[in-house]
Amino acid sequence: MVVLFSAVVYGYFWRIPRQYKITAANDAYLQKDYIRVIDSLKDFEIGQMERAQKYILATAYIQGESVDSFSTKDKEVILSKINYQSNEGIFDYWIHLGRMEVKEAENLALQMSDDQLLLYAYLQELSQIEDNQEMSGEEKSSKKQDLMKKVEELADKLHISYRETDAEMNTETNVGVD
């Protein structure tokens, strides 16, 4: 009797709501409602998601407003290099970046030895530093200088033109997520 009760409780309070959120995310993805995809899967830890959920969430973050440092054309190039068979680490990277977990994204980029992805993560971190109102001016300046040095080194290595003044990259021919 206790086992049956436990199974019912598990299904009712965990499995059914989880399946509902996954179904809602899939439906939103088909409708190209990327914000709703993100909202449906926001409570899921990366380790709890299947490959399909990771794929749709990663592409939703790229398409959505979460990754704002890219132009529409850059996003199209990035998306053209990602497919369902891509390395799951790529999906995890974009999910972390979309969730503003830049340190985790940087770590994944380093693990995959992907300088392009590392550069994107650095740019996202730079944006976070600039938007941080709680950081002292001295600390903000120091962190920005350190990060800008890393960004410029990677941009040079990747032959990407980078303008510090407006934090834009011209990545049209250099976007790579192999």
Question: Language-model features: where?
Answer:
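Transmembrane-cytosolic junction motif
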Residues: Y10-T23
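Hydrophobic membrane-insertion alpha-helices, especially the h-region
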Residues: V2-Y12
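C-terminal soluble domains/tails of integral membrane proteins
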Residues: K21-D178
